[in-house]
Amino acid sequence: MSKIKGNVKWFNESKGFGFITPEDGSKDVFVHFSAIQTNGFKTLAEGQRVEFEITNGAKGPSAANVIAL
């Protein structure tokens, strides 16, 4: 799987999900807190730059292996 870079569009900490806007201009990608690769509390900030992979889930594309840059 190839890594894609993008920016967090929004992330709801209480619900544990949000969306990432890929820098290549493609459609926003769903991100669940379980895909964030960090220790401790897994959250993302609006506008934060990230690197991730795209997987196809039951409800469409979603981010996997999300790493903050």
From Swiss-Prot:
Residues 6-66 form the CSD domain. It comes from the Bacteria. SMART domains: CSP. The keyword Transferase does not apply. InterPro entries: Cold_shock_CspA, Cold_shock_domain, CSD, CSD_CS, CSP_DNA-bd, NA-bd_OB-fold. CDD domains: CSP_CDS. Pfam families: CSD. It is found in: Cytoplasm. GO terms for biological process: negative regulation of termination of DNA-templated transcription; regulation of gene expression; transcription antitermination. Its main location: cytoplasm. One of its GO terms (cellular component) is cytosol. GO terms for molecular function: nucleic acid binding; poly(A) binding; protein homodimerization activity; RNA binding; single-stranded DNA binding; transcription antitermination factor activity, RNA binding. Keywords: Activator, Cytoplasm, DNA-binding, Transcription, Transcription regulation. The keyword ATP-binding does not apply. This is Cold shock-like protein CspE. It comes from Escherichia coli (strain K12).
